Amino acid sequence: MRTILEQIILGIFLLIVGSGITSAQQLNMGDILPQDTSVRVGKLDNGMRYYLRHNAKSTGLADFYIVYDVGSVQEEDSQNGLAHFLEHMMFNGTKHFPGDSMIRWLESIGMQFGTNLNAATGMEMTYYQLTQVPLKRESIVDSMLLILHDWSGYLALEDKKIDKERGVIVEELRQRNNAQFRVGNKAAASVFGDTRHAHRNMLGTEEFLRTFDPQVLRDFYKCWYRPDLQAIVIVGDFDVNEMEGKLKKVMADIPVAQHPKAKEVIRIPDNATPVVAVITDPEQQTCNANFYIRRAAVPKELNNRVGATYMNMMIHVATAMMNVRFGELAQQEGCPFASARLQNVPLTNTCDALELQVVARGNAIAEAFTSAYGELERVRRFGFTEEELEQVRTGILRGGKYAYETAGERENGMLVWECINHYVKNVPLMSPRHKWAVTQLMLAKQMTLQQVNEL
């Protein structure tokens, strides 16, 4: 018997309704879901992508983001920590904002460092944000675009500024050196195998942070922080046509990368036998077990297809039903686990996993994990019931209807992340109406208990 995933790949047909998804139209699982026309999506000649969206919810305000499709895994073994170090240097001088003039100017218009001006570096994605920007003068918009322009490829990266920041990041490393950080680093080899994901702790080591040559940081920046790996996302109370014109003008002088280095596709190797790791830490307050069932992720180019969305919906339904069971069991007297949860997690761009998280009552972790895993095995053998499916389906539909009815109340940040997920992962960027139509038909018309149980 073919699995549901195999059936999706071979092509199951769905009846989808709505503008662009009509009742007379049957879409194959390989069909692309319609994109929200209220988002202006474009690409500049230098390869930079952009997403612009008007949102009147926050009157007179806008969020400005630059997103990089790179992160710590682009570091070589001798560069561990450079991506995060660059995050700090974004605020330490650029072509048009020397020294700390950027922060001082932003504060002069009412923005706060750490709240409205911030950044985050991940394993495979990095972003820098300017949020709740007051659009009270046209010159403010021009300056925001100029900041994004400089972040794209015009950091000063002066030796004295780099040396000054070394101690700041070393102190951050010391502050983060808690039980969660240490346990996570030790567990990485078991989860990610012998890959870069297992050998990057985001911050680096104190020795490296204090001694690396500043030119190494400049070379890393020039190699990876380039327009073909970047996207600008701007959402707020502005005219999209005017913003697009300004964006194109400001970013026009950013050159196309010459001889760009290709991003390595990193795949997590399969293991012939189960990998088991026992990790202890004197500051760990709870006794936990995490169990991963890895699988290849849907390729990025297929993520905006009907089939990927349908598969994700079935996984969402199955994990929700499983978690209802766990919740009921945890309330029973004598249950060895305080909590248990099953969730789908994207480990990397190429690898997803079903993760079972178990927190024991006291230190009885073996009994707690055995109990939770036993329930998971029971579902694998005997499946869920129609009553369980109906309960979860009703809850998801209720939430979907509420999201559709309140779509006009979404803040800029929520709309920004829809664009970011489309850029980085190719997650469907659907309108609320299309999303609600798809949700209803997948749950109410197409999905069956047999399909979920065979997943």
Residue ranges of predicted features:
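His/Glu-based metal-binding/catalytic segments typifying zinc-dependent metallopeptidases
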Residues: K261-R325, Q357, N412-P428
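Active-site-adjacent, His/Asp/Glu-enriched structural segments that form or flank metal-binding
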Residues: T59-G60, Y68-R182, R196, N201, ...
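Mature N-terminal segment immediately following signal peptide/propeptide cleavage
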Residues: N28-I66
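Bacterial N-terminal signal peptides
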Residues: Q7-S19
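Structured mid-domain segments that build the active-site/substrate or prosthetic-cofactor binding neighborhood
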Residues: R295-K300, N304, A308-E386
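Acidic/histidine-enriched alpha-helical segments
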Residues: G99, I103-E107, A156-R174, D239, ...
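Scaffold signal of the M16-like zinc-metallopeptidase fold and its non-catalytic homologs
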Residues: N92-T94, A119-E124, M144-I147, W151, ...
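An aromatic/glycine/proline-enriched structural segment found at the starts
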Residues: Q25-L27, D194, A231-C287, T394, ...
